[in-house]
Amino acid sequence: MFAIDEVASGCRFVVTDRHGGVSTAPFDTLNLGGHVGDDADAVRRNRGLVAEALGVEADHLIFADQVHGDQVVHVDGPWTGRPPSCDAIVTTRADLALAVLVADCVPVLLAAPDEGVIGVAHAGRAGMAAGIAMRLVDAMRDLGARTILGRVGPSVCARCYPVGELLREQVAELWPVTRSVSWHGEPSLDVSAGVLEQLWPHCFDVEQLPGCTVERDDLFSYRRDRRTGRFAGAVRLVEQERA
């Protein structure tokens, strides 16, 4: 169920894999995306399994309606009605787990356990270029976060993400660190490098979690498979162990 499961200083970072759910091919088995053509009941059950493993109620595992933008929304409880269209969410609620859906884009997971603030962002090429990770940090600071821990989850690597020369240069003009080349020598982008560039000046501890979605068959990848599911990166606050 979890490709990565880390408890660190009062927070828990997880990245799901594609195993342990109930969806059938090509969404087998732990698809968490409700917009990909999978059976809605299977998605609901899969999300319930992840929520249970995280120790929260099913409706307390919070997803947004991701739109490849740069908007951040403050969450104060389970959604009533349709989730808002945004690509980052923040909360101070310890009974909520925040999650983002990905299948090549970068899941950004942030926590400030000492101040009781968490946030997540879905950083695709467009969102990264627009500074979604920095906007998430700013929103967390507005809620009192000071010492921020960050985890940047698995995504498509630069070697597997060829783009046109013009697009690469447009993005690299904003974030030079993203300029790269593919396995075949084509122009490419390193989106996760751009995310890390945005986070490093503002976070106490940032780590890139290993794995390329195209190269790892235990993770969903739209670029590799097209018709496929979505995995999630999630974070929640947990009680810190007392010495």
Predicted segments, located by residue:
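Active-site microenvironment for binding and transforming phosphate-containing groups
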Residues: 1-243
